């Protein structure tokens, strides 16, 4: 082969791709622990730089001007992708819905809060076909407002403006979504290796957790019915399961489906085999666009998207009762679209109930319903709700407005994070409200005094530390839920979670409440301490005392201002999903799972927004502080208990210890003296992974060195303080 045909850098020939042509570590060792998810979205991939603050930029934005531009865009049909019915509303509603609709409650991941629809795999999901065009239509507006308006906010705002421009009154809009700049590596979308694959069910039809869609590449359900079977009642069961996993109840589900399908149409007029590859697989000349269709012009009335064909209502660009009216007015018979997809047509449809052709208003064409739509009538629960909405249009409009707002804001966390003039004043239970501070906050003198009282209370260091960790570590960076603010650890359901050791927790909380009551009663002015603040302060005092015992004087920064939520402000069912299935930091697992304990530790660390270094130093410190579930000895590699030493790392790395499994599942281990055979320590996989995994061992070696004690304490305190304040959005 000639030298000209070889890459001058790598030596690869033209037949081998320069990028991705060699085996990666994960190709050689597919079971390797996936730590990269802990280092996503760093400043190295963010073109905005470390000093950029989106909140400050958004506050400069003229939101009214942006909305005016969006309203104008709705009817500014472009030749390269003409608007159905002369209005892009339906397209932008679908784009916003599919941006937000990937959210799932089980781990809080997905949703529209990061603008992730711009990246793989979402930008190439079959269910997102042709939404690339919607984003390209928005580019002139994004270009105009630049850094003041994120893609994430723009996509949701475009959906709102689409609804408003077609006559619907929305509930409001909150900005503040910060864009990411690379695909998310932490989200498990399923194990299937083909689009629309379905290997996620077991039993009769038990959907794998944490998934919230029935097939790979769909947002929720197959609109043709379960696995393409056009059974509306069976479709209702799938809809209920998937929407519930997105935090929607039955009434919200009906409102969303009926409200959203009041607008726009489906596209399936020709042979689906003529649709080209998705954006990530398309040629470079397509410039990031995909699904180029070879059917006719590939646009306008010859557009191919889902394979279904037709509008739901006779007037697809105005808010009315057309969807529910058609649903109940007619009987429906099964048919197939021109593309071969199962759908339903109304029997003996009246002339006035035909829809205009999307690009020729002189023509009238039949409307349609999908199998999923008919579930809104045929399902025994959805049916009566749909009928009530049909008979009470005001209830329907209010329910849809609220459900749409919830859909598009559910992953943003508490209302305090919302920005802009259109944030609704009403507090909603799903926003996990906490009361505003209504008292003077404690200062440095009171903080020092309270620490003394906490340490003199008789509560041991392990109980103070584990209670504080239990309160703060519920936080999820995915949907900004959980955390210590609100002191919900004293409320149902958290007070009863096994991992929180309810009997010990009750004892600790009673003592903390006693201290709080006495302190507040002594104050002559309006100064008070909340239980939420005192819970965190107790753990901080315990960590500082443990560090002093190790010879290190440290003061953990403490910012008061947390308040105490009530049980009425706490949705028990909604908070139940925050219960840890496993918490490696406390060496806890509720049961054995198909994934390894160390994988669950990394997953939990990612939700806590920890780096691998922070995860490592926190776990090593919590072990010697005695924070294990039920005081388990596993991983407590120290003889100096309740002392913040680097002993965990020193003893983990000691080659004088030989480890062997003591359970057939290889999840618990015993470490014996390599020479004498005497037992030294016991451990779980979560403990030993820090000596086994090469990357984690490298970090452990830093903290296990002879000169590492001071650095270990400093790094532990920094990571601890980070977790304590993850939900303090007002100070972050």
Swiss-Prot record:
Family annotation (CDD domains): catalase_peroxidase_1 (cd00649), catalase_peroxidase_2 (cd08200)
Transmembrane segments: none
Post-translation changes: Formation of the three residue Trp-Tyr-Met cross-link is important for the catalase, but not the peroxidase activity of the enzyme.
Keyword field: Heme, Hydrogen peroxide, Iron, Metal-binding, Oxidoreductase, Peroxidase
Co-factor requirement: heme b
Residues binding heme b, per UniProt: 261
Cross-link (Tryptophyl-tyrosyl-methioninium (Trp-Tyr) (with M-246)): 97-220
Active site per UniProt: 98
Highest taxon listed in the record's lineage: Bacteria
Single GO BP term: cellular response to hydrogen peroxide
InterPro entries: Catalase_peroxidase, Haem_peroxidase, Haem_peroxidase_sf, Peroxidases_AS, Peroxidases_heam-ligand_BS
Keyword Iron-sulfur: no
PANTHER family the record matches: CATALASE-PEROXIDASE, HYDROPEROXIDASE I, BIFUNCTIONAL CATALASE-PEROXIDASE
Name of this chain's protein: Catalase-peroxidase
Organism per entry: Chlorobium phaeobacteroides (strain DSM 266 / SMG 266 / 2430)
Protein's gene: katG
């Amino acid at each position: 082969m000639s030298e000209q045909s070889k890459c001058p850098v790598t030596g690869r020939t033209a037949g081998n791709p320069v990028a991705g042509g060699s085996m990666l570590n994960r190709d050689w060792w597919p079971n390797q622990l996936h730590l990269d998810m802990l280092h996503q979205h760093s400043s190295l991939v963010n073109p905005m730089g470390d000093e950029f603050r989106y909140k400050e930029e958004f506050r400069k934005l003229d939101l009214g001007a942006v909305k005016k531009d969006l309203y104008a865009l709705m009817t500014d049909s472009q030749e390269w992708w003409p608007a159905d019915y002369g209005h892009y509303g339906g397209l932008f509603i679908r784009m916003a819905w599919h941006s937000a609709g990937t959210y799932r409650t089980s781990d809080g991941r997905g949703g529209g809060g990061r603008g992730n629809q711009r990246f793989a795999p979402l930008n190439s999901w079959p269910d997102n076909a042709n939404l690339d065009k919607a984003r390209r239509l928005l580019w002139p507006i994004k270009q105009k407002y630049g850094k003041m308006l994120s893609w994430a906010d723009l996509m949701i705002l475009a959906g709102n403006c689409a609804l408003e421009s077609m006559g619907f009154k929305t509930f409001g809009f909150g900005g503040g979504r910060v864009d990411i700049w690379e695909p998310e590596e932490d989200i498990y979308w399923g194990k299937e290796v083909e689009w629309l694959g379905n290997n996620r069910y077991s039993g009769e039809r038990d959907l794998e957790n944490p998934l919230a869609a029935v097939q790979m590449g769909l947002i929720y359900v197959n609109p043709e019915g379960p696995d393409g079977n056009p059974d509306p009642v069976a479709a209702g069961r799938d809809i209920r399961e998937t929407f519930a996993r997105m935090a929607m109840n039955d009434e919200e589900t009906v409102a969303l489906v009926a409200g959203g399908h009041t607008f726009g149409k489906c596209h399936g007029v020709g042979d689906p085999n003529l649709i080209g590859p998705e954006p990530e697989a398309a040629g470079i000349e397509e410039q990031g666009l995909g699904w180029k269709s070879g059917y006719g012009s590939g646009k306008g009335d010859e557009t191919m998207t889902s394979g279904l064909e037709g509008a739901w209502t006779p007037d697809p660009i105005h808010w009315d009762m057309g969807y529910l009216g058609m649903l109940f007015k007619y009987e429906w018979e099964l048919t197939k679209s021109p593309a071969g997809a199962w759908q339903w047509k109304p029997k003996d449809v009246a002339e006035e109930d035909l829809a205009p052709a999307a690009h020729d208003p002189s023509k009238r064409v039949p409307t349609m319903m999908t199998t999923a739509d008919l579930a809104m009538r045929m399902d025994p629960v959805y049916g009566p709700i749909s009928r009530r909405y049909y008979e009470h249009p005001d209830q329907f409009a209010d329910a849809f407005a609220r459900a749409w707002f919830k859909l598009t804001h559910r992953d943003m966390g508490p209302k305090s994070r919302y920005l802009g003039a259109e944030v609704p004043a009403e507090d909603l239970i799903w926003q996990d409200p906490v009361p505003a501070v209504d008292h003077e906050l404690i200062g440095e003198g009171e903080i020092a005094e309270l620490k003394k009282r906490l340490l003199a209370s008789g509560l041991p260091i392990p109980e103070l530390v584990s209670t504080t960790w239990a309160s703060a570590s519920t936080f999820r960076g995915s949907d900004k839920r959980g955390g210590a603010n609100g002191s919900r650890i004293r409320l149902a359901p958290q007070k009863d979670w096994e991992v929180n050791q309810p009997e010990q927790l009750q004892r600790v909380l009673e003592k903390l409440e006693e201290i709080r009551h006495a302190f507040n009663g002594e104050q002559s002015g309006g100064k008070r301490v909340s239980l939420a603040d005192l819970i965190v302060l107790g753990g901080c005092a315990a960590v500082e005392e443990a560090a002093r015992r190790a010879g290190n004087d440290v003061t953990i920064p403490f910012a008061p201002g947390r308040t105490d939520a009530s049980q009425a402000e706490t949705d028990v069912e909604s908070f139940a999903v925050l219960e840890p299935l496993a918490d490696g930091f406390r060496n806890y697992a509720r049961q054995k799972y198909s994934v390894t304990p160390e994988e669950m530790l990394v997953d939990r660390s990612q939700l806590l927004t920890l780096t691998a270094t922070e995860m490592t130093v926190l776990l090593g410190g919590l072990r010697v502080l005695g924070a294990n579930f039920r005081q388990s000895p596993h991983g407590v590699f120290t003889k100096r208990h309740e002392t913040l030493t680097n002993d965990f790392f020193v003893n983990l790395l000691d080659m004088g210890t030989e480890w062997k499994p003591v359970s057939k599942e290889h999840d618990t281990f015993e470490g014996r003296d390599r020479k004498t055979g005497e037992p030294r320590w016991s451990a779980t996989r979560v403990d030993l992974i820090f000596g086994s995994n090469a990357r984690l061992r490298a970090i452990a070696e830093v903290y296990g060195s002879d000169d590492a004690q001071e650095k270990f304490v400093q790094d532990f305190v920094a990571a601890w303080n980070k977790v304590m304040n993850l939900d303090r959005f007002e100070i972050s």
